[in-house]
Amino acid sequence: SDLMICRYSYNYDEITQITPEPLYWESFNLAGDDLLKEIIQQIIIEGTVSNEQDRDCSGVIENHARQLGIPEVAKKLNGFFGKDSNNIGFKGKLMRINFINQIAIPIALRYMGHANKEGDLYLSFSDLFTTNPPGKELLDYFENHFGFRFEDIRWKLSPSKVNEITQSVFSKLVGQISGLVGLYNCDIVILSGKICSFQSLENLFLKYHPVTPNRLINLNNYWIGRWFPFADNNGYITDSKTVVAVGSLISYMGGTAHKLDRFKINNQHLCLKLVSTADYIGPVKQGVIQDVVLHAKNSDGTLIAHTLPFQIGFKNIDSIHYPSRNIYAIDFNDQKIIETLTRKGTTDASRLNDAVEAFKHKIRSRMPLKFTISREFDKDKELVVISEVTDNEQDDISKSYFELHTQTLPETTGYWLDSGEFTLNIRN
């Protein structure tokens, strides 16, 4: 999710010229995919039925299995959706990914599509998959694993359940954004993007009250006119993702090509002032940087790594409460280690992998390692290099054995949409 706060000025002398000046800009690692993940986990996979409203829309698979008296439900759920273990083979991982793509995501999108409507809607498997049904092999694998047919499950599309999850996912972020909007005394707030089409999310902004309701504009239901290339016959935007593309085109036509009649956009400030927000860099864990290592007045710093890979993040403001994002990871440089072993005479391909692992093991036995990293703040905030490495006895280790590579995802194993993994709440 992106936030931009601008000051706008304009001049009118036969030609109207608008000049946006960016005051604050930031991206946050929370968006529609995170909501999708929570809906899949809380509605489709696992959850408790605390009242009648939760029935058929909370942990549907788990509760359907419990109603049937299926033994070891938690074990079965973790064996299918949980983090990879030695018990999940290649086929299990493949079926898990297929389940997410063929079943979970389509069902979650149906729930999200019903979120702004009134009343619950009960659907069967055939109602959900009128087209593009999941493959028979996947459905058979599901039955073999859980002990019942997925097609027998009944689903209740509950707007209140989806809106409850939406507010729990975005409440903290909307509160922080509203605080920033209030700090800058913004006159108008514009919401865009598919995720803002949820009325519950718009209600969160109204709850935190960054501006008066009439100054909160949601482009998902804003009449823009039929001139917009992606508007419907009534002049409303059909796909909110097109707003950025069309806005960029208008900026180019009015600011560079000068092809808009008596209208210009002076984008000079946007070109000069929009720079990286990686002002503070340090070790990151669960989106939080406790100790800042590099900042504007400190071009060198040290990191203590007890394990590799080691995650490094950045943030715009030096506050423990300010959201941080991953940017780099320190890990072994396998290529350099192979080159070192080859020079020492290890050339047998069958032995090389074992030699590399043995080499890494020797380095790990000297942990914790102290990495000295540096950058030139004024030249490039994000260009960080490893300048020195020492072990737990202050002996030097060649820095060439390590690499600092881009790692913007918190999980080094990959994104959840690619792996299908979930961290489940284990219950007996």
What do these predicted ranges mean?
Residues 33-41, 168, 217-277, 419:
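Glycine-rich phosphate-binding/hydrolytic loop that grips phosphoryl groups
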Residues 200-219:
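Short acidic, glycine/proline-enriched helix-loop-strand junctions
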Residues 4-8, 192-194, 219:
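Generic beta-strand/beta-sheet core signal
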Residues 291-428:
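Long C-terminal appendages of very large multidomain proteins
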Residues 4-145, 257-344, 382-384:
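Phosphate-binding glycine-rich/basic clefts of nucleotide- and phosphate-handling proteins
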Residues 1, 186-205:
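Glycine-rich phosphate-binding loops at beta-strand->alpha-helix junctions
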